[in-house]
Amino acid sequence: MITKADKNAVRKKRHARVRRTITGTAARPRLNVFRSSKHIYVQLIDDAAQTTLVSASSKDKALDLTNGGNVEAAKAVGKLAAERALEKGIDTVVFDRGGYLYHGRVKAVAEAAREAGLKF
């Protein structure tokens, strides 16, 4: 019998493996990306204090998006997260792609955040 691993389970395993080495601090928080089929979510997390410093998602009222599951929405979310981070005085982060491939929406979030002024 041929069995195929669940994609999300494999992603979670990959993310756990990466998270052993990547940690965020108050000075340099972790920019975490979560992607669903309809929306994309970004958080800047201080792992030392276990707090979320900044968050943005395609569900935010500030963005007023009709479709939250495409590359354009991901760019808008990345830009919004970077703007909110810069308002709080955060300019450098550690990028955590959440076990997803660095492609498509995840890449769009990263590039938009870089263009808006975050360094990573």
From Swiss-Prot:
Disulfide bonds: none annotated. The keyword rRNA-binding applies. PANTHER family: 39S RIBOSOMAL PROTEIN L18, MITOCHONDRIAL (PTHR12899), LARGE RIBOSOMAL SUBUNIT PROTEIN UL18M (PTHR12899:SF3). Pfam families: Ribosomal_L18p (PF00861). Belongs to the universal ribosomal protein uL18 family. The keyword Ribonucleoprotein applies. This is Large ribosomal subunit protein uL18. InterPro entries: Ribosomal_uL18_bac-type, Ribosomal_uL18_bac/euk. CDD domains: Ribosomal_L18_L5e (cd00432). Keywords: Ribonucleoprotein, Ribosomal protein, RNA-binding, rRNA-binding. One of its GO terms (biological process) is translation. GO terms for molecular function: 5S rRNA binding; structural constituent of ribosome. It comes from Exiguobacterium sp. (strain ATCC BAA-1283 / AT1b). GO terms for cellular component: cytosolic large ribosomal subunit. This is one of the proteins that bind and probably mediate the attachment of the 5S RNA into the large ribosomal subunit, where it forms part of the central protuberance. Part of the 50S ribosomal subunit; part of the 5S rRNA/L5/L18/L25 subcomplex. Contacts the 5S and 23S rRNAs.
